[in-house]
């Protein structure tokens, strides 16, 4: 079997791989996203997701040339603007009020490298339609959402309480969580990480 490394500290991505029984190691990349976002501010939010994934995976891949190494990132776009994770939970109300009753886009970017060379790149966009929730619901949500307010760019955990924010979604469940699993497992089978 081919050695497979996830170059990410994302707990949700690691959980997805574990739940799918995919053998992997975690070696977190120490790339500073803010530097890349500043240097590549010309990119669309969709292309930024792939750019960040590639930037994160490259140093880990070069350090472990025998392995397939996956970099993954996700960006959020609202009204054409790339939004970042909130630095503090107190800003979540304004973010969620801005999102209320409107769609936003989650762009997932995956880059798989071996010895620093690209093996596979993938992008997928999901459209999330936020419902016109009441102020009372928003108060309750903010009181109970906890870590999700700053852990994800949308101030929600789609797989948890955050699911109550939405009226509908267009996209794959795993892509919304930040790791499009089915296209990934197909390429992992092709490269000997998983059985055909």
From Swiss-Prot:
- Cofactor(s) required, per the database record: a divalent metal cation
GO (cellular component) term, any one? cytoplasm
Q: Which reaction does it catalyse?
A: a ribonucleoside 5'-triphosphate + H2O = a ribonucleoside 5'-phosphate + diphosphate + H(+); a 2'-deoxyribonucleoside 5'-triphosphate + H2O = a 2'-deoxyribonucleoside 5'-phosphate + diphosphate + H(+)
What are its GO biological-process terms? nucleotide metabolic process
EC number per UniProt:
3.6.1.9
Please name the catalytic residues of this protein. 73
SUPFAM superfamilies named in the record: ITPase-like
A Pfam family it matches: Maf
Q: Which InterPro entries match?
A: ITPase-like_fam, Maf-like
Domain of life per record: Bacteria
- Write out the annotated subcellular location: Cytoplasm
Q: Which UniProt keywords apply?
A: Cytoplasm, Hydrolase, Nucleotide metabolism
Which GO terms of the molecular function aspect are on file? nucleoside triphosphate diphosphatase activity
Query: Sorted alphabetically, which Gene3D superfamilies does this protein's record hold?
Result: 3.90.950.10
Primary location recorded for the protein, binned into one broad class: cytoplasm
Which EC main class describes this enzyme? Answer: hydrolase
The task this protein performs is described as: Nucleoside triphosphate pyrophosphatase. May have a dual role in cell division arrest and in preventing the incorporation of modified nucleotides into cellular nucleic acids.
Write out the similarity annotation: Belongs to the Maf family.
| Protein name (Swiss-Prot/TrEMBL) | Nucleoside triphosphate pyrophosphatase
Instruction: Give the species.
Output: Maricaulis maris (strain MCS10) (Caulobacter maris)
